Amino acid sequence: MREQIMPQQNFTTTISVDQSPEEVFDAVNDVRGWWSGEIDGTTDKLGAEFRYRYQDLHRTTQRITEFVPGKKVVWHVVESHINFVADKTEWNGTDVVFEITRRGDKTELRFTHIGLVPAIQCYGDCVGAWGFYINDSLLNLITRGKGQPNKKEEAGK
């Protein structure tokens, strides 16, 4: 008997802006400007790794595995710890993909988190967070020059 496997629905969202693909690419790589002030490491070089932390709830290490100026960036999650789910490492081995395409007089940014699927426990919370960071914070960084990243925590807090 063969088991039928349902296709996994990776989380994806798309925004369209007036800015050039190069401007969108630069904003994507300004991770501290739209995701978090709690980023350590290099976020704009092929092969580089950077770490993200949000309080004691979530931390990850990403390696930049694709870096094509004006077109594409891929982060491979090499380590993660999500404190509010049973499998604290459920992001390990997933990929965060930013694809940039010129469509007429607009630039389209398609964000996909490959491996962030409804079957994993953090899906609802993680989709909500990515939705904000991409559709609000990154969009505002691209179009207005200022995103809404998590602030860097003060020492001792």
Place the predicted regions along the sequence by residue.
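Short aromatic-glycine motifs in intrinsically disordered, low-complexity regions
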Residues: 48-55, 85
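Glycine-centered tight beta-turn/hairpin loop motif at sheet-sheet or coil-to-beta transitions
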Residues: 8, 55-57
